[in-house]
């Protein structure tokens, strides 16, 4: 199974933001309203954020929702 490029883009943005801001998985999850386990799965491309989280993720990551899909 091939993971679509946009999943990788979202994962990379989340991981970079967490690293730049020294946030743990748990701390970032609290910002979004999800568990640390969910964030970990997003970063590892095991699964991806539900569409309802994308606007909130975009605000936190200071990007637009369509930036998550820029490589499609």
What residue ranges belong to the model's regions?
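Short, conserved catalytic or interaction motifs in soluble domains
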Residues: 44
């Amino acid at each position: 199974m091939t993971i679509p490029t946009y999943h990788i883009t979202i994962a990379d943005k989340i991981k970079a933001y967490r690293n730049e801001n020294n946030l743990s998985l748990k701390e970032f999850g609290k910002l979004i309203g999800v568990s640390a386990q969910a964030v970990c799965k997003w970063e590892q491309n095991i699964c991806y954020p539900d569409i309802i989280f994308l606007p909130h993720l975009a605000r936190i990551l200071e990007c637009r929702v369509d930036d998550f899909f820029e490589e499609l």
